[in-house]
Every structure is written in structure tokens, then in C-alpha cells.
Regions:
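Conserved catalytic-core motifs of GNAT/GCN5-like acyltransferases
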Residues: 107, 120, 125-142
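Short glycine/proline-centered loop/turn elements that form peptide/ligand docking sites
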Residues: 85, 89, 111-115, 132-137
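Acetyl-CoA-dependent GNAT
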Residues: 8-78, 89-91, 95, 99, ...
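Active-site acidic-Proline motif in GNAT/NAT acetyltransferases
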Residues: 76-78, 82, 110-112
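Extreme N-terminal starter segment of soluble prokaryotic enzymes
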Residues: 3-5
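Conserved hydrophobic beta-strand within the GNAT/NAT acetyltransferase core sheet
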Residues: 70, 104-108
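Conserved acetyl-CoA-binding loop-helix of GNAT-fold acetyltransferases
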Residues: 81-94, 117-121
Length: 148
């Protein structure tokens, strides 16, 4: 990949981030939600991954005291298969540690085996199940976590 950068999300990135969101998720977040997260949520940290100044993915992280939670992570479908998700996830984990996180957790669809495999590479293990967690199809979510 040519010029790859991972950096904090800025308000001016939201349009491109929403484009990724719409391409990836059946029930995408709105511009307003991203604005609130980036501009107003003091516990939230969002990052973008860009190639040649084009945003191709993003990740969200909340850190409350020493508890870190991945809120979302997405890579544009046309950029999958290049390990960008791993790069972005690893960077986000490093930021969680830097921000004082001692534990990291996330939810992942039961059907998303590829994501579960990637999270396991980073040491996350299943810790529970949230029944009917996803509103689009009532799919269960596996809660995964790791000590940082």
C-alpha cells in the first residue's frame, strides 16, 4: 500500500467515515452520531486509516477509568484482504493501553468468524453472549475481552 496513515479522526473526516459505514453496515451510524462521539463524548477516541489521503476504515474506542471498549471497527469492502483491519485494531489496542486501559472488550456477531479470528490473534477470548444484540436481524453477539 502506498501512503498508509492511521491517525485520530477529525470532524472533517466524518463524511468519508460515513461512506465507509454505509458500505459496511446494514444499520449504519449517522453523521450526527459520529459528530457526538468525536466532538462531545469525553470517553471516546476514534481513529481513521487512510491510503493516499483517502479514508478506507475507522475504529472507535471508549476508555472509562481503566476499562476500554471497542465501539466499532470497519474497513471498506474494496480494501479488505490487505491486513488493514489488523493494523487498525493493533493501533487501537496500543491507544487503549496508552490511555490507561487495563482490559479491552468488544462485541462481535456470532456469524462474523473472520473478525473473531482476527481478535483471537490479539489475545481476545470469548467471555459471554448478548442475546439478540444486533437490531437489524436480532443476531447474538459474542463478548470478547483481553487484559491489556
Amino acid at each position: 500500500m502506498a501512503n498508509l496513515v492511521i491517525r485520530p479522526m477529525e470532524l472533517t473526516d466524518i463524511d468519508q467515515v460515513v461512506d465507509v459505514e454505509i458500505a459496511v453496515f446494514d444499520v449504519p451510524w449517522s453523521e450526527d452520531i459520529f459528530y457526538q462521539e468525536v466532538a462531545e463524548n469525553k470517553f471516546a477516541y476514534y481513529f481513521v486509516i487512510e491510503i493516499d489521503e483517502v479514508i478506507v476504515g475507522y475504529a472507535g474506542l471508549w476508555v472509562v477509568i481503566d476499562d476500554a471498549q471497542i465501539t466499532n471497527i470497519a474497513i471498506s469492502p474494496s480494501y479488505r484482504g490487505y491486513k488493514l483491519g489488523e493494523k487498525l485494531f493493533g493501533f487501537t489496542m496500543e491507544q487503549a493501553i496508552r490511555l490507561g486501559g487495563k482490559r479491552l472488550s468488544l462485541e462481535v456477531r456470532v456469524s462474523n468468524i473472520i473478525a473473531q479470528r482476527m481478535y483471537r490473534k490479539f489475545g481476545l477470548v470469548p467471555g459471554g453472549l448478548r442475546k439478540r444484540y444486533y437490531t437489524d436481524n436480532q443476531e447474538d453477539a459474542i463478548v470478547m475481552w483481553v487484559n491489556l
